[in-house]
Amino acid sequence: MTTSAAVQESLYVGGTWQRPEGFERFTWDFEAALGESSRWGRWRDGLGMDAMKLDLFGRTVDLIRDRLTSYGRGPDRFGLAHCDLRLANLLVHEGRVKVIDFDDCGFSWYMYDAATLMSFYEHLPGAPGLIEHWLEGYRTVRAVAKAEEEEIPTFVMLRRLLLVAWVGSHAESDLARSLGVAFTDQTVGLCSAYLRRFG
């Protein structure tokens, strides 16, 4: 089953949802993810960091910041999103996909949700296929502009480096221990490919 049913039921609230008076959620923007006041820790404190990774990741972060500044935060591309749509947060119940765990739900770019679907798997060969399935379902409720689709790799890198920070700041957790330094090492190729493509 693809994520189509989950998308139809849960994801694109931004186009029809009216924000109630007094409603507040945090924002997942560049600063919250990769800035100095990042919510899940500093990417520089990822496991196994060295001078080469600090330089490579730093150049990637700079490019992400520049691209997202150009991309903007207009209401057609930024609003309330789930912000943690990884596979562990999809539940199949009676043949239907349900989205769970809205703890991290907040205001962000809609295409950021596409990147969160691939959390911890961004480096695997099948990862792009997950995004294609996600887009298939997403397009049943909302058109995706070419500029949005073209920026998905930026959101993938934003998420990946945010997870590098999370692993570093949660090093005692079972998940972080299972990922270890290898997760940071596997990020090197992703950063290099991103810089070649967009740098």
What residue spans do the PLM features occupy?
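Active-site activation/catalytic loop segments of kinase-like enzymes and analogous catalytic loops
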Residues: Y110-A143, R159-L175
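ATP/Mg2+ or Mg2+-diphosphate-binding catalytic cores
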Residues: R44-G46, L163-G199
